[in-house]
A protein has these predicted regions:
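A short, hydrophobic beta-strand/beta-hairpin element that forms part of a small beta-sheet core
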Residues: 13-17
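Terminal-tail/helix-coil boundary detector
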Residues: 154-166
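A basic- and aromatic-enriched beta-loop-alpha substructure that forms the phosphate/nucleotide-
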Residues: 24-36
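GST-like fold's C-terminal all-alpha helical module
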Residues: 55-152
Length: 166
């Protein structure tokens, strides 16, 4: 339950009492740390901690960012910058090499369990497939994301436009 008087998560915006957040990775981390403990967090004393932090940053800065530019120019401003849209799509696809390689011998990205890193990185794959950038589904990424997207919690989360709690 919210520690503030109300919690609201709506259209990628979190309000929890006096706390207001707009960045998705920060929101996920905040919720786990404020309302945990949670196995979704990799702690500093775990071997994969640095990798975990890197994947959290990688999810938005390296993977989701080029998709947002692609979304803008391929779907919202068609014809304005078609070359830029295709360039950002290619950039995104090239950045998947690291993820595909990481998943060669792993079920999850960090600490041999489902963590926030999986949630945050898989959003980029979900967005890519929503935009029909199906080239993102390299074999290991496809296996991993299928498992994540079949989780009951994922199905519940994607079945609603937003969640509001008072």
């Amino acid at each position: 339950r919210s520690r503030g008087s109300e919690m609201c998560i709506r259209d990628r915006y979190l309000k929890d009492g006096k706390v207001e957040m707009t960045e998705s990775v920060a929101m996920c981390t905040y919720l786990c740390e404020q309302y945990g403990p949670s196995d979704l967090i990799v702690s500093p004393d775990e071997d994969d901690y640095a990798d975990y932090l890197n994947w959290l940053a990688h999810s938005d800065a390296t993977l989701t960012f080029p998709l947002t530019v692609y979304l803008r120019y391929a779907l919202q401003e068609v014809g304005v910058a078609d070359a830029a849209a295709e360039g950002y799509k290619r950039w995104f696809l090239a950045r998947l090499r690291l993820l595909e390689k990481k998943l060669e011998s792993r079920e999850y990205l960090c600490s041999d369990r489902f963590t926030l890193a999986d949630i945050c990185v898989s959003y980029a794959i979900y967005l890519a497939t929503s935009l029909n950038v199906n080239e993102a589904l390299k074999p290991n990424i496809a296996r991993w994301s299928e498992k994540l997207f079949n989780r009951d919690a994922f199905k519940r989360a994607t079945s609603q436009r937003f969640i509001e709690e008072s």
